[in-house]
Amino acid sequence: MSFYKEKSINETNLGSFVDESNELFFSALSESSMNHGTPDDSILLDLVSRSDNKDLYQDSLDVRDNFSNLSSDEIPQSSSYEQTRKPFFHHFNPFEFLEATSPLQQNGKSRDTEKPPSMKEKDLSSNSSSQHDKAFHERVDQGKNKSSTTKYQEFRTVADYREFSPGQSVNSLKPNSGDEVPSTKSSTSSEMHTQLLKDEQKKILTPAPDVPHDVYCIEPSLGRVFSFPASFVASPLLLEDCNKIASCDLPYSTFYANSQVIDKFSEYFAYVDQDPCHIRVLNANTDQSLILYTQSDVKNLHFGKNKHTKPHLLVMDALSNLYVWKILQKRSEISVSLLFTIRRANYGICDWIPNSSNMFSMIVKNSLYIVDISNIRSNNISPKVYAKDFNGLQAAKVDLPGPINSYTISSDRSVVAILVNSQIFFYSFPVSNLFSTNPSHRGNWAAIATMSLQLPSTANSISFLSSPPNNNDIIDKVICVSYANNTILGLFDFGLCAFTQEIEFSNEKEKSPIQQLLTFNNSNMIVAKRNQLLDIFIYSPSDLSNVGVLSNTAALISAVSKGKRFGDSGYINKVISNEVVDHSIVFVTLIGCDSSKLELILALSSGYFQFCIESDSKFDEGTSLEYPNSDKRILARASLTSGLKSNNTLRALSQDLKNCAKSKDDSTTQNLTESLGSVCYPSMPFFNQYVPQNPNEVRENISSVMKSRIHAKFESLHSRVELVVKNSYMKLLEQTISEAATDEISDLFKLIHSKPFLLEVGFLETGFLANDLENLTSTYRSSNRQLCDFSNRIGNINQKLEKLLMIERLETSDQSPTSSSNFEESESFAVSKKVLELVRISKNKEALICFTKDPSIEAFRSLQDVPDYSLDDCSSIHLLAFIHVLSKLIIKEEQLSFSRLQLLSRATSRLRTMTLSVFNNSGTLTPELFSSVVRIVLKNVREFVLIGNSSIQKSKHEFLITTLQALLREVDIFLNT
């Protein structure tokens, strides 16, 4: 099918041209293979915040929105079993204290809604490293004496094995608590399981006695982002807990990228033997086996999953040879029959159609082929001839506009989704009558919908995710999209027509891309393999109980593309993670999945193992590896349109842009350059992180950032502009940039469209949407006045804060230093002396105000004798100013550092009790200003350099961060209600 021909859907009947498709299929097999690689074109900006070098404390307030700093906890990574790990809080849970003392919880005028039942905290206890090491080695020693037929491992959460070193912090939102549980050698899996069930009834989860851990429960909602913290340690998966299938030496060098070297169907196993050119087929019931031979190293092998036919094995080798064997069981002997071989087939991806053993799909160049082998008979086929000489081999295909990156077929076999660059094309899949002998009854390939992905980087792969509804009709409600070099997985829920979840497989400490992404028919489980980790996610999609007439996935996608919406938000229901200890994972395959258990086959460097995970009642509520940050939003966006999308507008506009530099009409150039300026930063992290102070700062920052990075942006602009035009981040741009940036952007793009620049970046051939660009230009101009007013309002925040800080200052002494060289030292000494005198006569409040006015190390040293409860007499404005100046002091003495933490904690707790009354009774201290100062204080506290190795000091520092975060959440709730 020609992608650009103007044909109606009814005329697009590729199944009716089987003969023509066969000829194209066989001719394409002998040509060169296609290239699937696409570079990552991530265009995220990082703006380094400025800081002045002061001897005592930092510069005056910079009112900035540091969302990224708030969500990135610096947690050092440590070994799994070598360091001593103890929880920070043994007998005191600061989170419970914060909840109990919150005015929003106690005040009858609380603006917050009642927490749902699923927002229950489960504080779990931890053990020391010595107990863990002892129990771990005892388990290994016991495992060596186990039989190789051990089939099941207890189903545990990822958090069951999460560990922290003394230098690490537990989650600041919900620190773990509880008494330590002693480790006993006699503890068995069944005893632990029984104890867990008993503790669940008491609402107390007791961990496995040999490992420390913590678990946080979350309330499922739209837009959650799950990430793996740097300190995350997965559950150790011991081979003694698996059923060994075969022992083999399988080094990584033997196999290729995305290899599948083992599969199972019914009672048959097929796996690559010690020789990479040998495939061993094993009957698990009779222990009989035989060896199949290939011309070169095996790259992939798959069993057909049709339970009503004989097993068929599809094999591909490194020389692009394709084999199909039929497995036969004759009484007590196992035998095979080679159906056919395709020599040197330059295919990309090849696999069976779901629940089929007579049709498989494969990619050749820019086309997806469906091959039918149901009419082939092995007794009259010579395995040495080419496939084009066979009688009975049928093929149908669909052509795409570019190289196919990935494709997936729905569980009900009604839809095939094909990923090309940043677009997903959905076609109806008439599998039942695609190769009907009657031409009038043959099914049609119909274009259902097109999804335009708007991602921070290029999409890598796609996969359908299904779950059976009440009527037992399988409908795939979710499509998984991996991007950012397979480090982020986004879940697009068709019920809401939006990305509802993102799972991040990387953090600041390590990058762990997804090396394999697996889903199983009729299941909502996602299995991701990364390095030596197996991560399992169970997604509960939106409820489609009200769809009624929708009978399959094709009907659902078609209805959603036309504007209909079904159900509520989906959410990640369960998270499990296992780490294979001392072994490398070559490949993982799913062989069975239902509501009670999950069966996997692991191809490890030492052999093949069958691993079964059984469900457990303690996973009824959702668990997360890291408590989601409410400020962290999903970046992935997508728009679903009905049918195929025309690209005629793109081609027409590309010529206009190419001739832009030759035009002498300034108005034409101005329109185009301003439009390009609107789409230059699709993700807009610059404007997310920095709020401009005034128009001059806007001009300065826009100029410096754009001039230094404009060339790098245009290197990726050729593949992104069409998507960015409709990106929702354009609204963010219109709300934050000021009118002062217009002239600067215009001058920059006039330079860009000069002839020398066009010669340098000749790839500007890519087109843009003319109408959308024109509309954006009009919107951009009309919003300038509002943006300028917003910038001026933000610019006044610093001035207002400075005025507030002077309300309660005391008059300074009349002492005047005679020498300018010792002015600062004399003033600091005078303030310190005055503070000390005020403390001596018990005027604690006046001493605190004096320090707030002129903060210094000497003045703070004089405050050490002031009891922290004296802060209760201070006003809210003074407390806010006090925690601000105290957080900026640079302290290098352990005793002073400890005193600062104690005073900051007391002042912050006092602020929490008076927050609502401050906002209701004060006309000057606004919630916006209050929130800005608290964010700056939180940023400064996170950057404290603790002096000494006192565990008490570390716990107080952690508690202070938790208190500030709780205060910030309460202010945000007040602002949002």
Swiss-Prot record:
A Pfam family annotated for this UniProt entry: Beta-prop_EDC4L
Residues carrying Phosphoserine: S165
Species whose genome carries this gene: Schizosaccharomyces pombe (strain 972 / ATCC 24843) (Fission yeast)
Bias-annotated ranges (Basic and acidic residues): 109-124, 131-144
Annotated Gene Ontology cellular component terms: cytoplasm; cytoplasmic stress granule; cytosol
Domain of life: Eukaryota
Protein name according to UniProt: Uncharacterized protein C12G12.09
Region of interest (Disordered), residue spans: 100-152, 166-194
Keywords: Phosphoprotein
Residue ranges with Polar residues bias: 166-175, 183-193
